Amino acid sequence: MESWRSTFAAPVAVTIVRKMTGFRGLGLSLSNEDPVADTLAVVAAADRLGFEEVSLPESRLFNSVMPVAAVALHTTRRVTVRIGVANPVFRDPVLLALEAATLADIGPGRLRYGLGAAEWTVRRFGMAPPGWRPLTNTVEAVRTVRRLTAGEALDFEPTTFTVAPGLRLDRPPASPVPVDVGAVSRRMMEVSGQYADGVQLGAITSVGYTRWARERLAVGAQRAGRDVDELLLSANVLTSVGPDRTEARNAVKEVLAYYLARVEGVVVDEAGADPEAVAAVRAAVAEGGEQAGAAVLSDSLVDVFAVAGTPDDVIEGLGPFADAGLDLPLAWYTFGPDRDEGVRLLAEQVRPAVVQT
């Protein structure tokens, strides 16, 4: 049996030198908490306004992502719809491949499929299987979906699920579905560089964390003899835009406080944020909730973990992400004090300034 565990050697130094030339596109990353009709309204706007991609999450227990994605693909014409992300605990990897093939049939060439362990969520729900190995489970699911949607049988023997040797999809899509990983840790970034088509950075991100993630992705790609520039590094970038700079910046503070209190340590450590400012927010959230955290959240933390303000502020804030190696920013969650106005400003003023022509 082929083994990939031996690839976890000591970290390799890889230098990434990139010049800001613009992003491959600009997308929207939506909330899973809104009613489906609201989500589909934003998807329709993204399709109409020229965004390259819209990402649909499956966090917590609000909406199941697959039926929403199916309707999104059926009712749009040009925008790519991303599953961002599904996990191979709630769904068997073969079922994930079948769902990917079905979605690809609904929207040919417009599906990007994100998989991730969603470890915090799975454990919080008490759904972690006995002896669960999140990294192994994710890698095997990624390899399974990529092989089966390419019309091939598995080229490895899975250890986290069972499948008959030689099994293939009865009707694979016309072309393989690109599969990304919702990665956070060093090891997950590196195996993504080996086996996936890209990585989607989730929750809150920063320029420093993006640069670190690109380096780790390159390490994995190098091990597999792949070119990291052929992979897609995307990220949920906490974004708020509006005509009033102060209102737009204030609009991200509560959600930023929520995630600063919960996000994995590496996300904050690699960001270069003021540790005392982060500690103050965490203490306030622990005592009084997200609103209390937002009240003590400094402007410096907004600068590190969000792009927020006027359209010019957002354009300026996105530039360093491209220099750090981000290919596709996914404006995430807030959009602005007025959601619809924020989406319009992103399309009309921000996107033309930051996307490659």
Pin down the residues of each PLM region:
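Active-site-adjacent structural elements that line small-molecule/cofactor binding pockets in enzymes
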Residues: A13-T357
